[in-house]
Amino acid sequence: MKKSGILNSEVASVVAGMGHMDWLSIGDAGMPVPMGTKKIDLCVDKELPTFMQILENVLKEMKIQKIYLADEIKDQNPEQLENIKQALPDVEIEFMPHTDLKKNLAKTHAFIRTGEMTPYSNIILESGVTF
């Protein structure tokens, strides 16, 4: 049995397989996932697990060079935006319309669905390189 880090086998496998500039997405319970995009559904109940719980655990094992967020998070969920900025203080942020963020999920290696119930709690992580 694995002793530490990400214990969910699907999430651990996706993170371990990420290369430089690959994309991984994490989102709220309501985010539609395009056909063909691997969906890892961790949602157990409302707010279980939360978006930030999953993001923080993924960040322990994945180098991030850039993130993509919906423009709408600035006005509709500024508290979550601040949480994201605190978790990724030195990472470039690119904002785009929510409709474009949804379309870009098709380019991600996987979408991790959380139990998050706050609007626009969705992110695309662009993998960095550790050397």
From Swiss-Prot:
Which terms in the Gene Ontology molecular function aspect does this entry carry?
D-ribose pyranase activity; intramolecular lyase activity; monosaccharide binding
Per the record, what are the reactions this protein catalyses? beta-D-ribopyranose = beta-D-ribofuranose
What residues does substrate bind to?
A: 28, 98, 120-122
GO CC field: cytosol
Residues of the active site:
20 (proton donor)
Record localization: Cytoplasm
Give the main localization category.
cytoplasm
- Per UniProt, what is one Pfam family of this protein? RbsD_FucU
Q: Part of which pathway?
A: Carbohydrate metabolism; D-ribose degradation; D-ribose 5-phosphate from beta-D-ribopyranose: step 1/2
- Origin, by domain of life? Bacteria
What's its EC?
5.4.99.62
Any idea what job this protein has? Catalyzes the interconversion of beta-pyran and beta-furan forms of D-ribose.
Similarity section: Belongs to the RbsD / FucU family. RbsD subfamily.
- Subunit structure, interactors included: Homodecamer.
The name of this protein is D-ribose pyranase
**What is the native source organism of this protein?**
Limosilactobacillus fermentum (strain NBRC 3956 / LMG 18251) (Lactobacillus fermentum)
